[in-house]
Amino acid sequence: MEKKVTVRDVAREAGVSVATVSYIMNNRTDMKISEETRKKVLQIANLLNYRPSQAAKSLATGRNSMIGLAYRLNPNTPSRNLDLINFSNLLIERLNRLKLDVLFLPVSDTLVINRNIDGIIAIDLSHKDFAMLSNNCFVPIISVDMLINDSLFYQIYSDIPVLIERAHEHLGNDFAVVLEPYENEAYLEYITQNIPGENIILTSSFAETVSKIKGRKVLIIGTCLALMLRSYISDSDMAVISCSEYEPPLPESVYVYQNDIAKKANLTINILLNALDRKFEVKHDHKIAPL
């Protein structure tokens, strides 16, 4: 059986201390190490096929390189569920590129927290669910598409009301906004704050939604929801707010407004990384302008 290469083997071959190898392999920038030494250690580590264990990394950096991802899927909101999953995939892809693992945290009344988590990204949780999460997790929590309004937490959310205002250019002044309910009550209220009550159509049953949109001009939030309803309304009487990068395409005859999902994902991760490094920003409210 081939002997496993250790940090001591790399240090011996490179002619440096074990601590120096550890600093270099864990990208420690607070230690003064010459570029020549850094390159030499990395080359030898590569030649020996040395990979530090997760436990060793944790001891060296004080981190476990594990990020929790918390959201709740609702069987009554299939289009919104797809948006959540697509946005989560965007985050996971970027976090993995940074050598960070992601653990899904199912939000339930029997929430069990993995103590190896360094930080959490929570997406569209109700006030009750977020309170349960934050009361049990004492790590940085970044809330996305939620209005928490608590200086302990950062909140990042899409400025959907701006897109609703833009829709007047295409649909005129009298149109209904069709959307599935969001989990976060305050964010849903923020989205619909400037819409007359009779023009808000929150989907409950499909048949009821179809009956409400017939003969009306509508702005639909979510591409999947738009595709489900498209058979019951002409393309000229509808516009769509896209909430994902990975949605199925709509025909060119349908007017589509785009949220800047990539910017939201990048900002979420940047703020999380700063929080993990204890670089806390003064600004805790980040509204993402659309494309």
Where do the protein language model's features map onto the residues?
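A short, well-structured beta->alpha microelement
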Residues: 98-111, 194-214
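Flexible loop/turn connectors
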Residues: 230-291
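N-terminal helix-turn-helix DNA-binding module of bacterial transcription factors
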Residues: 1-62
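Periplasmic-binding protein-like
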Residues: 117-123, 175-181, 214-224, 239-243
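An alpha-beta-alpha
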Residues: 165-200, 280-291
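Alpha-helical recognition/docking segments in bacterial nutrient-uptake
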Residues: 72-165
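Hydrophobic alpha-helical segments within soluble ligand-binding/sensing domains
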Residues: 152-178, 257-280
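Short beta-strand segments enriched in small/hydrophobic residues
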Residues: 22, 59-76, 174-180
